[in-house]
Amino acid sequence: MNYRVRRLWVVVASSVVPLLAGAAAVPAPAGTNLFGFTAAESGNQRELEQRFDADLNASDLRGWLKTLSSEPNQVGSPHDKANAEAVRDLFQQWGWDAQIETFEVLYPTPKQVGLELLGPTKFVATLKEPPVEGDESSTRTAGGLPPYNAYGADGDVTGDLVYLNYGMPDDYKDLARRGIDVKGKIVIARYGAGWRGLKPKLAQEHGAIGCIIYSDPRDDGYGAGDVYPKGGFRPAQGVQRGSVQDMTLYSGDPLTPGVGATRKAKRLPISQAKTVLKIPVLPISYADAQPLLAALEGPVAPPNWRGALPITYHVGPGPAKVHLTVSSDWGLKTLYDVIAKIPGAQNPDEWVVRGNHRDGWVFGAWDPLSGHVAMMAEAKAIGVLLKSGWKPRRTLVYASWDGEEPGLLGSTEWAETHAEELQHKAVLYLNSDTNSRGFLEAGGSHSLQHLVNDATGAVKDPETGVSTIARLRARMLVRGFDKSASAEARHDAQLAAAGGDVPIDALGSGSDFTPFLQHLGITSLDLAYGGEDDQAGVYHSNYDTFEHYVRFGDPTFAYGVAEAETVGHVVLRMADADVLPLQFTDFAATIAEYVEELRKLTDDKRKSSEELGKLLDENAFSLATDPIRPVLPPEREPAVPYLNFAPLENVVTRLKASAKAYDALHAKLEAGDVKLTPAQIKELNGLLQGMEQALTTARGLPPNRDWYKHLIYAPGALTGYGVKTIPGVRESIESNQWDVANEYIGITAAALSAYCTRLDRATKLLSQGG
């Protein structure tokens, strides 16, 4: 779904060389333990992983990608169902118990869309993506859907046009300072700077009657690089499709929040579905946007609002008047989730769950099939191990999700259907999505941070041959050396110099980890390669094709193999370690940073409010504005009280001590100095399996986001995909809800205290084996 906005953590890459299929691991020094394994176990595990690597083959990935992306495969299409059946059959052939699980979901598809400029000149938008020379796939659009935004309302509206920049909250403040109101208007915003669904949601809340979203060439067209087919970036008539379902409230089927969308499920009327918008929304190309924007007058747009079209950007309103019409079929469609299992030989009730979605907006070669074929390679290699006599300690569950693009439908409905079982059995959910040349990007639960470092530190970059961690540290040091480096880059450079674990990112939303991590509290991880590619230009368009991917994504499929190898090592270690390989010192340090960020956020907000108040009292804004083109002063900000962060600061001190004690005894377990009975191991793993759920709250998050339960990681109410850490406190501070902030300081501190208590129980159990 979202190709790269939620991740900060990166590791590997450079230029293109041919891929040699097979193992690409960097041999660890002899006698070095793998995290979670004794010396003897480490040798066996390395040998297992080498056998796994030897069965990863780039030609497999290429062949699967070409087949799966050969026709449009959106939800409800014949090719989507055919792909599900083909994937199921392959899993069965490889020795997995694979079945298709179906759900019935609300999935609107367009019947009629139209956009025309009525005056001062006339123009009718084409709303089509023509074939591109040299891209045979782009000609095979029969059965595909035209560009549209799913879950925008039906409507036939006419009104003056207003340009909104990116259509985010600060843009409305800038409009207000220019005396412009969007009530009763149709707004046009460019993609970027935040999740697409927030643009029409905010427009709706501000009284707009329709919303148009376009891709400006400055962001992913000729302003970023050569356009397709010369380069990889968005051509003039390329359109980014996408869902505008309000997933800041909940993901999944809009009609069945919190329960699986089975045939017999009780459904809301569409009019009561909170995630379905109330105004029509339509995405367009920059070729179609240019005549609309050129017809605007009113104030000239501020410098940071100006794109790369050869026009003067004006804000409006008018004199441009537009007519927008959207009509959809609002019926139910069937989802086809492929669920494949290998039962655990010793711990069958502990599940390692692995998933990647399969559906696309059109062909979906990049998003999601590049990641999906890597997952298939893992499954095939695991099948070879299985047929050789190996069996995993824990149960493996591999999932090919349907319906991710419209709103994480397949994963959410499956997770909600099996919620109780997952909360008792799942020890990990490991997600992937788009994959391509570049850097390893990892995000997730910070108790997994050390495992990620340990597993990826033994993997070669396919193109440079150096270890991922060594190359990452070099990158971090170089970025921090830049005199204009951000505070984050300088902080990363300090971490690189210190030589400890490289941090993984916190997860917001945008892919199928969301229902597992943020709704159910399952320890989760998201892994991919990317960053040295031109995917942005064809994201969610007719040009996300096999031809584009093999030119600009991963020509040799080296990074597909690297993805399979990296993810496979994590899966195998989680499956086979006697004691779940979690480490808590990194988690404690991360929480300490988040709490310090909250204090700084409050202090900075207070200082800003005071400085703004002083400038307003001195009439500084009115004196500084251009009298010919006046800009109104900003609104006065409320006073910022002093919050009591002591409950969080005190629990952080306890958390650091608890984490240090557990990790020290776990290290002794690896060294063979701690011996546990099978019964003690089972009890210990039971405690560890539920650690992440201790960080959730049954009441959910404010404001009115009860589906989101996680108190440490959540997508922001005003960022969409972007993460907010300690969200109940952070977002309450940002929205000046001081009583709610104080309340969630207490709620979050209590959850972290319960987390410490559970961890202390695990430590006590380990100590009994000394």
Feature names for model-found ranges:
Residues 139-174, 249-366, 380, 384-388:
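Soluble metallo-hydrolase cores and metallopeptidase-like ectodomains found primarily
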Residues 26, 30-47, 54, 66-186, ...:
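Noncatalytic luminal/extracellular "stalk/propeptide" segments of secretory-pathway proteins
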Residues 56, 60, 65, 69-79, ...:
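Sec/Tat-exported extracytoplasmic proteins
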Residues 673-770:
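C-terminal amphipathic alpha-helical interaction region
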Residues 122-124, 234-300, 347, 403-550, ...:
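Metal-dependent peptidase/peptidase-like ectodomains
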Residues 47-55, 69-78, 147-152, 186-193, ...:
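Second-shell loop/turn segments in exported
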Residues 338, 354-408, 413, 567-570:
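Alpha-helical metal-binding/catalytic segments enriched in His/Glu/Asp
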